[in-house]
Each structure stands twice: as structure tokens, then as C-alpha cells.
Amino acid sequence: MGEALNGLKRNIMCGDARESHIGQKVTVMGWVQRNRNLGGLQFIDLRDREGILQVVFNDDLGEEILEKAKSIRPEYCIAVTGEIVKRESVNPNMPTGMVELKAEELKILSESDTPPIYIKEDLDAAESIRLKYRYLDLRRPDMQNIFKIRHKTTKAIRDYLDQNGFLEMETPILTKSTPEGARDYLVPSRNYPGMFYALPQSPQLFKQLLMVSGFDRYFQIVKCFRDEDLRANRQPEFTQVDLEMSFVEQDDVMALNEGLIKHVFKEVLGVDVKTPIKRMTFKDAMEKYGSDKPDLRFGMEITNLSDVVKECGFKVFTDAVANGGSVRGLCLEGGASMGRKDIDRLGEFVKTFKAKGLAWIQLKEEGVKSPIAKFFSEEELNKIIETMGAKTGDLILIVADKNSVVLKALGELRLELSRKFDLVKDKSEFNFTWITEFDLLEYDEEEGRYFAAHHPFTMPMDEDIKYLDTDPGRVRAKAYDLVLNGEELGGGSIRIHDTKLQEKMFEVLGFTQESAWERFGFLLEAFKFGPPPHGGLAFGLDRMIMFLAGTENIKDVITFPKNQNAFCYLTEAPNIVDEEQLKELGIETIKKEDTAE
């Protein structure tokens, strides 16, 4: 059993000790990083969240305290009282490297088993072990630093929004299931057998209702939940910086959020974000970069070759254009030296995005090399090279298909080439852009109906509302995403605030009037009572912290994350619950049949 504090108070953090503290008697508390005996002296590196301080136990302390110090193992939790003195051998790699603590008293507060992972920065343990012993993983200095950054970020966000007239308000966690998009997490109701609450995918409807309520400016740092198949940087529960504003247009919301980003990056990293942030329409982003979240830290834009090749002798190209598709290409500077096997691998890569193949042209010193060169006249070939802006030493890569396939394949190929050839030269750059004028709707050919590209409450652009009846796919949205280095940092829109227009939107999405009122009647009813024009935005806080902390793994910025299958190694959730609990809720579980042959 560990020793009690008995009134002992810590008066300095280990990592805060400096030369200015020399001669002071202090008490520090923390965890033992390592313990070693050198020439009869016992040295302990003691760690807390602020850093590491060397503690020295001299041989004049007496046998009892020296033996006690020698017995200490890594991760023991201890308290040491003594005097800060100048260190004989300075360690320039440590902030506390000029001083050490000359111990006088020692308390072992608790002992530790041998840790299953090392508490160090360059940890190479398996993810499953790190997550199972997350409380140990979080002791590591780099993890501690990430969560200091997270704290500084949320404080900066709150400070800025408070200064700009926002009220921090909470919205319900137990709410109504309104399935349209990702699956809801459902919570059974004991009081209403057979009925369920849903955990919110976002506070979207409630924040709109708060605008109807007259609160004018709302924000919340809020947990959201989505029961979806997890990709690399997704979690089933995540944190959103959610805000909404009344009596605003799109430019007002974007300007406010540019100010927020500028404030956060300055406060947390000391980085000046240039504002106003550049803007790009969704159409331009797709045509130039094959993505609605383009990475603009490097060039290599997609070039449309359709007009150049529509009457050439290569049937693959002419058919693609004749069928309403396109022929487009990328130019990889210096890529002419790439071997045939590597080019073939790129061909296989684009096939994973439904492209039928990849045509290529190498511009070598000795001339043009390409398996498709024989289908073109010299004039046609030169026109392709000129249009692509290519020169000797470059490689042209071309895809021909329907537009959606061409743009997706080349967009992904552009990113693959960036990774392969390290095209992003300044890894510390923060390149922001707004993407605007998104399509309001997306058509699902399998289901034969339109879906909301963002959500059903997004306001159409004024000049496009007339097309809702005749050509819904043509309608653009008053929606905007903020993109940073090829990742969506946040997104929002101006909202519909008119009952009739909202009903029309539901109709276009295939809802009957009855089903729309059944799901969203509370919102439609509220719109009858003088709703203000309003709009907002939500930032993914976890993703923002990833950029600020310089990590590529979302699990690093969440205290207790789930794995790729939404499983918690620490608590082993989800788990089987007691039959009595299920019975009380009126739930019976059905085991899935083993379909393996």
C-alpha cells in the first residue's frame, strides 16, 4: 500500500523547474521515467505532464531513504521534497536540463507493475495494445502535448465566439431518428416499449430551432454519433464545433469563420492565416483537381483534351467524347524516366476507380514514346503535348470515360503521384480554400431518386430555385466547405427558412407530404412562426486538432478512441448485457446465422 500525502503539497511541476528556482525548497510529484545508480548516487527522472526533472539522492541521506530510492521501478508514482540546485552535467536537450532536485524526503505514493508499453515518444507498440492500455499511452509526452493543444484550441474557439456575440448552448443527446444519410445509433426507451431515441449525427435541427427562438448566435462543442463503416480517419463518436447565425448571408458566415480560423491558428501555433481565404466553385474544383476537397499545396491540374482529340484516329478517345464523356490528362513533370512496370501499376490504380485504363505519353530526349502514338498524326500529337503544357522529360497520363469516372480517377491519381513523388515540398504549409456552389442534389441511379448532397435543409441558390420542378440536378446550393491541405475541415450552408420551400425540397427527395411531416413536422411547424434567415457551419474539432498537432491519426487526438470496427479495447465495448435488462426494455436479441460453407 502506498504512503499517504498527509498534508504534503506539490508546489512546482517537474517540467517547470528552471535556474530561477535554484536554492528553493520544493515538492514535486509524478511518475518515474527511469532510475539508475551512478557512482553511489541514485538518479531518478521524474515525469509529470509538464516534463521531466532529474532527482538526485546523495549518499549522505541515510541508508533507509537510499534503499527506498533504489527500490523504485519505472512508473512508480512518488513525491519528492528537496532543493533545486544547479546541475553539474547540463543536458541541453531538456528544458529542465540546467537544474536538478537534490532530494531530502521521499514518499512512494503507489507502485507499478512492469508496464506493457514503454512510456516514450517513439513508441512502436501495436495499436491494439496502445488502446487497451490507453491510460499508459496517454502518459507519453507527445500524447500529453496533443491534449494540451486540444485544450488551447477549444479555449481559443470559445474566446473568439464569445467576443463575437455567440451564446454556448446545449442541445439534446436523446432525440428523434430522422434517417437520411448515415445510420443512427438507437437507444431503446423503457417507458415507451418498442420505441427508440437516436443519438444525434449533428445538432442541425435544434440549432435551427434556436434561431427561430431568437437567440441570434449559437455555438456548441458537441459530441455527434454516426453508425457507419469506419474509414481511416473516422470514429463512431466525434466532436464538432457547431455554430449558427441569424440574419446573415453566405459571405457573413464565411467571414466570421475565417476570423475564427485565423484566431485559433494564431493562438495555438503562432501561425498567421491569410484572409480572406481564396474561393473555388465545386465545378472548378472537380474539373481542375477531380475532388471537392483539393490539395492546393502542389499544382498538376487536370487538363481537358476532349476538343483536341474528338476527331482523332484513336477510337477510345473519340467514343468517350461522342458518348458525352471526356478525355482528360495530367502532366507529371520529370516523369518520362518512369519505367513501364511503374506506369502499368498506375494503370491498375485508376481501374480501382472504374476507369477502363490509362493512356500515357513519355516525352524523352530521343522523342515521343507511347503505345497510342501510332493513332495520331504528328500535328495531333503536338497539339496534345501543347495543350498539356508538357516539355521534354515529362509524362502525360490520360483517362477517357464518362466525366464522373474521368475526374474521380485522375483526382485520385493526382494524389497518388503526389505521395509517390513527394510533390508537396513544404509540409508545414497550411493551404486553405473555400469550396462553394455545390450541387444541391445527387442522383442515385440504383434507387432512382435524388438525395441531398449535404442535408435536406440547405437553401438552393436564388437563381436556381426555378429548376426544382423541371431539372433538380441543375440546382446549386448555398453551401460552402472549408478545405485545408486536401481535407475537409468544416462545412455549412444557408438554411431554408420557409415552410413551402422546405416541403418542396422534401418532395424532390421523394418524401410524401405525410412522411415529411411525420419526420420533420416539428421543424415545419416552427417555420410558421416568423423564422429569421439563418445559416451556419460545423468544424470537425478532431480533424482540426490533427492539423494543429501534426498527426495523421485521428485516434491520437481522442482520449479513448474506438478501433476501425468501432470496438473499444480498453472497456471491451460493445458488450453483451444482462437478459433482465433486455427484458425490461422489451428487446430480444437474434443470433446471426453462420453463413460460412
From Swiss-Prot:
Q: Where are the transmembrane segments?
A: none
Q: From the UniProt record, give one GO term of the biological process aspect.
A: aspartyl-tRNA aminoacylation
Might you give the EC number(s) for this enzyme? 6.1.1.12
Residues holding L-aspartate: E180, R226, H454, R495
Q: Reaction catalysed? A: tRNA(Asp) + L-aspartate + ATP = L-aspartyl-tRNA(Asp) + AMP + diphosphate
Q: Which InterPro entries match?
A: Aa-tRNA-synt_II, aa-tRNA-synth_II, aa-tRNA-synth_II/BPL/LPL, Asp-tRNA-ligase_1, Asp-tRNA-ligase_1_N, Asp/Asn-tRNA-synth_IIb, AspRS_core, GAD-like_sf
Query: For ATP, which residues are the binding ones?
Result: R226, D227, E228, Q235, E488, G540, L541, D542, R543
Region (Aspartate) residue spans: 204-207
This molecule's function is given as: Catalyzes the attachment of L-aspartate to tRNA(Asp) in a two-step reaction: L-aspartate is first activated by ATP to form Asp-AMP and then transferred to the acceptor end of tRNA(Asp).
Query: Subunit arrangement?
Result: Homodimer.
What family does the database annotate?
Answer: Belongs to the class-II aminoacyl-tRNA synthetase family. Type 1 subfamily.
What is this protein identified as?
Aspartate--tRNA ligase
Species of the source: Clostridium perfringens (strain 13 / Type A)
